[in-house]
Amino acid sequence: VTRLTNILAVDPGHQKCGVAVVNEEGTSLVQKVIAFEELRATVEQFIAEYAVECIVLGDRTHSKVYKKILREFQLPIEMVNEDRSSIEGRMRYLRENSKGLKRLLPLGLRTPDRPYDDYVAVILAERYLAKRRK
């Protein structure tokens, strides 16, 4: 049985970030929104638990600070264009998590009931995988 490569994607933000481990088929294995202070511990845990082989990092807000920390893990770091990823993440979150009558509202009128940075991280991973396949 060949093992799929797992990548860790990080959507960097000022006080919080989205993190997700995605396999090379694009399946999210774990995703969560964490405080910036939890970054090291979470990354360490995900690398150990999911045999992560590569880190994907969004190229905008605070990415330099994040890259400096992520370098400590001595894995390849790939920068990914974050353009419109927050909008895509918000829409995906709303599509997958709207319940009851909220589902009847157009996506643009719905409001997420929690931060959705983890969905943005999954989208960054998908962008990296799509670029790698070309």
Residue map of PLM features:
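Phosphate- and other anionic-substrate recognition elements at nucleic-acid/protein interfaces
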Residues: 2-10, 14-134
